[in-house]
Structures are given as C-alpha cells and as structure tokens.
C-alpha cells in the first residue's frame, strides 16, 4: 500500500523558518518534518511513498537525491574517477520514493488526482499532509477503514483550538463540518487518511479543487466519509510557536511520534 504525502504548500504562516524552502522541509532536529512523517509510517512497514510536489520542489528532490551521502560515512577519491565507497547500509535504504510534480498552485484535490498513475493496481492508499506529526496507530487505522468499506477514512484529532470541527454521527460516520471551533472539545481533520481508489470519482479536473471542500462534502452527502478517532498526540507545524514546540519535544527526547 502506497503512502501519498502532500508537499506542495508555501508555508505562508511560518515564513520565519520557511522563507526559501517548502514547508515540509522545515526541520525538526536535523531532518525535515517530511522525513519524520515518512519515518513514522515506515515503522509500521509502509515504505513506498508518493510525494506531491509544488513550491520549491527542487529542494525536496535534492534532499532525496543526496540522501545517501547525507546520512552515510563514505570514502571518495577527489580525482573523481571512482564512485564513493559507502561503509554501512543506512536504515532507509529500503524506502521507495516517487517525487511527482503536481503544480505550483494546484490545490489538495488536484494534487491527489495527478498522482493516480503512480498508485499501480492498489485499491487502497494512505494520504496525509507534509506538515503534521502524531502517534496515530496506523495498523488500527487501516483495520478500521477496511471494516466499514467506505471511500475515505480521516483521522479525527482534538486540536489546539483554531480549526473547524467535524460533526460525527453514529458509528463514526461524518455528518458535516463546523467551520468555527466550538468549546465542546470536538474533533477536527488531522490528515492520516486511508482512501479507496473510488476517491478519484469525486475529483474533477480543476486546479483549484480543494479536497477538504467539494469532494469531502459530496462524500458526506453520500455517507462515504468516516472518522477514525485519535485521542493521542497530534500537532501540525503552522506557526513559529509550533515549530519551537516540536523541536523542543524532539530535543528533550519527549517526541510522541518517535518510534525509532
């Protein structure tokens, strides 16, 4: 099963640390938040990734092209006649990463539509945002998705408090969206989706197609959108304060998403 990650955002609300790089390349410790997300999935055995690139895509491409040199000890002849000799196998050597150009200004729905050709024959794929981490139980998430047979499962999380909430009915079926946060302690869309291939029936050809609007609203009307409840840690990196929080947790070895 492939894991699709949305990596095309500008990071306009966190320009202090993302001025010349795409948002998923903002670092936690010495590595991008994108790497942390991928590493988390890999801990559950999911190592086949499709990255939806947009703004500053060359930065992400360069990171993966040069990844082996970045993380390995090696010996190199400065004459340039021979390839470097690497001295150990690095942990991520079995990752398969497809880097897909999905447009500079394409919105989330358009980006997902454009990577359909890279999913092969898989009927199910995972999808998440390239700017948020959590300690979601990926195995339980997939099992829940398979149990109900609907088109899309999103992970419902309890947020810091500046997001629109989900209206959730019986059995986890999503009935609608509340744009303004309430004081009820409700759940929001935290990403970490599991998707049936039937999702593409809800994606039209518009570049400005926002997955979280028309397609998800249609899924709600059709009774095809379900929520996997997650009451553990979840945190996006949308502001400089959140950048500091995630780096502080990581530096103190208190990061809940670190399973490695």
Label the model's feature ranges.
Residues 33-36, 111-114, 215:
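Well-ordered alpha-helical segments embedded in enzymatic catalytic cores
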Residues 43, 117, 218-221:
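Solvent-exposed polar/charged
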Residues 123-126, 133, 138-146, 158-161, ...:
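Catalytic-core segments of class I nucleotidyltransferases/pyrophosphorylases
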Residues 60-170:
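Conserved beta-loop-beta/alpha segment of the NTase-like Rossmann-fold superfamily
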Residues 25, 165-168, 216, 227:
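A structural signal for short hydrophobic beta-strand segments in well-ordered beta-sheet cores
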Residues 1-67, 99:
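N-terminal glycine-rich phosphate-binding loop and ensuing alpha1 helix
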């Amino acid at each position: 099963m492939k894991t699709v990650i949305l990596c095309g955002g500008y990071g306009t609300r966190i320009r202090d640390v993302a001025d010349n790089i795409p948002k998923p390349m903002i670092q936690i410790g010495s590595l991008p938040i994108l790497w942390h997300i991928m590493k988390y999935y890999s801990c559950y055995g999911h190592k086949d990734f499709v990255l939806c690139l947009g703004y500053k895509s060359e930065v992400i491409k360069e990171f993966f092209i040069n990844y082996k040199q970045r993380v390995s000890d090696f010996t190199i002849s400065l004459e340039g006649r021979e390839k470097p000799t690497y001295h150990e196998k690095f942990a991520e050597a079995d990752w398969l990463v497809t880097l897909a150009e999905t447009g500079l200004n394409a919105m989330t729905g358009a980006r997902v539509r454009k990577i359909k050709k890279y999913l092969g024959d898989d009927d199910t794929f995972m999808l998440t945002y390239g700017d948020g981490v959590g300690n979601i139980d990926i195995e339980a998430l997939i099992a829940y998705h398979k149990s109900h047979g609907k088109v899309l499962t999103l992970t419902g999380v309890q947020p810091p408090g500046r997001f629109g909430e989900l209206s959730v009915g019986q059995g986890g079926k999503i009935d609608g969206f509340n744009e303004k946060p309430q004081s009820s302690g409700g759940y929001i869309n935290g990403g970490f989706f599991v998707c049936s291939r039937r999702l593409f029936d809800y994606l039209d050809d518009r570049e400005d197609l926002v997955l979280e609007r028309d397609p998800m609203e249609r899924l709600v009307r059709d009774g095809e959108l379900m929520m996997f409840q997650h009451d553990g840690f979840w945190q996006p990196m949308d502001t400089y304060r959140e950048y500091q929080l995630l780096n502080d947790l990581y530096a103190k070895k208190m990061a809940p998403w670190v399973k490695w």
